[in-house]
């Protein structure tokens, strides 16, 4: 049995690829992010350290991709990679219609690293300048691009890093491929390495000659080129079963460190991401707090289960249940659902029930179903016996 299990696990590992190949696949929307992925949270310093580690030859831990094909592509919402990050103001990814695109990979593990590489090579990172205001403007949150100091390295006394990468304000760099700072040190825009590699008529040698780059600096450029275009730095495991629940369970397992994710958290993320008209996160949060104010300590898990109980033939919490069509149905009937849930707990409280005496909130689901589908929304004390007659 153990040999068989090992074979199944190993069968999913694919041939490693270069960083440049991964970037190209992101460009072509072959790598996308599922709705349950978290927002990008890495700092500029973390991205700089990632590039330093790559230059030192340190490996990137393996990633996990889910091959999405067929009907699964349109059952859920997927997102593009973030390229222009703005601290606090632009941290969310843009959704992408997937009905007319080829099969693609959804990144289950590796989002932060791949996004960091993408921003470093093709995008920008803006964060608030010291003592500036928090409202967004280019002045307060200047756009920065990743640059590589090719004039020197860090000393051991300066930093635990060796290679100097830094996000430089575009007002300083003028967005040039190479700029010289006040200390007469040369900074190379990291994303330029992609163009130099692809242009057969104008590569590193020609660039170095035009910019008076010395031998040691050119060696650093070649090392960067090798890291991006030659070394097979991206190792990944492919999951190709069209079972969203399995993909989510894998995602939960690999993200179990730190703040634990539950299956309910994932369903909540999918519900929020797939709502088109209402702010589902705020609406559900407000409803939960409203019910808690009545003395019943429910969570968003109860609200999600109520969606299934009211509308779905299968009341199990499955990813496949929370597809776009189902979420649209919930969204269109949200006001009635909200009122039914609120009045359910008014009714339970009028019966003398409390959070302490409710052994399971699942027991209240049939009552919710009855109230909702018979449109018995507004409950008052004089009419209470009508519900139990």
What are these regions (language model features)?
Residues 1, 278-279, 334:
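Short alpha-helix boundary/capping motifs
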Residues 6-44, 48-312, 355-356:
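Basic- and aromatic-enriched surface patches that contact anionic nucleotides/nucleic acids
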Residues 377-389:
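Single conserved hydrophobic/aromatic residue that forms the stacking wall/gate
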Residues 309-374:
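Structured, charged N-terminal subsegments at the starts of enzyme catalytic cores
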Residues 1-4, 82, 164, 368, ...:
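Extended hydrophobic/Leu-rich segments
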Residues 258-260, 375, 387:
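Short amphipathic alpha-helical segments with coiled-coil-like heptad repeat character
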Residues 1-9, 386:
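N-terminal amphipathic/basic-hydrophobic helices that include classical n-h-c signal peptides
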């Amino acid at each position: 049995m153990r040999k068989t299990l090992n074979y199944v696990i190993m069968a999913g590992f694919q041939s490693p690829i270069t960083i440049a190949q991964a970037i190209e696949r992101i460009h072509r929307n072959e790598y996308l992010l599922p709705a349950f992925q978290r927002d990008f949270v890495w700092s500029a310093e973390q991205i700089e350290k990632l590039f330093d580690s790559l230059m030192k030859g340190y490996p990137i831990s393996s990633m996990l991709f889910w091959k999405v094909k067929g009907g699964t592509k349109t059952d859920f919402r997927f997102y593009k990679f973030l390229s222009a990050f703005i601290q606090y103001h632009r941290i969310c990814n843009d959704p992408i219609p997937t009905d007319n695109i080829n099969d693609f990979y959804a990144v289950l593990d590796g989002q932060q690293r791949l996004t960091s590489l993408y921003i470093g090579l093709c995008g920008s990172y803006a964060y608030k300048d010291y003592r500036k205001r928090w409202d967004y403007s280019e002045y307060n949150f200047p756009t920065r691009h990743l640059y590589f100091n090719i004039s020197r390295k860090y000393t051991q006394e300066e930093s635990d890093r060796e290679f100097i990468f830094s996000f430089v304000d575009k007002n300083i760099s003028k967005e040039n491929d190479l700029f010289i700072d006040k200390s007469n040190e040369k900074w190379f825009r990291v994303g330029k390495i992609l163009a130099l590699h692809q242009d057969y008529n104008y590569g590193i040698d020609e660039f170095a000659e035009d910019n008076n780059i010395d031998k040691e600096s050119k060696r650093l450029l070649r090392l960067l080129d090798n890291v991006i275009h030659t070394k097979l730095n991206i190792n990944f495991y492919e999951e190709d079963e069209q079972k969203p629940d399995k993909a989510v369970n894998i995602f939960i397992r690999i993200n179990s460190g730190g703040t634990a994710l539950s299956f309910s958290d994932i369903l909540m993320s999918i519900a929020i991401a797939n709502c088109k008209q209402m702010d589902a996160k705020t609406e559900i949060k407000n409803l939960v707090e409203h019910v808690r104010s009545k003395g019943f300590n429910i969570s968003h898990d109860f609200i999600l289960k109520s969606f299934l109980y009211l509308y779905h033939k299968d009341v199990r919490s499955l990813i496949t249940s929370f597809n776009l069509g189902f979420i649209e149905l919930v969204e269109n009937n949200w006001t009635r659902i909200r009122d039914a849930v609120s009045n359910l707990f008014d009714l339970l409280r009028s019966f003398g029930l409390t959070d302490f005496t409710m052994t399971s909130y699942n027991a209240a689901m049939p009552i919710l179903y009855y109230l909702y589908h018979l449109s018995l929304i507004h409950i008052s004390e004089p009419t209470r016996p009508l519900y139990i007659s």
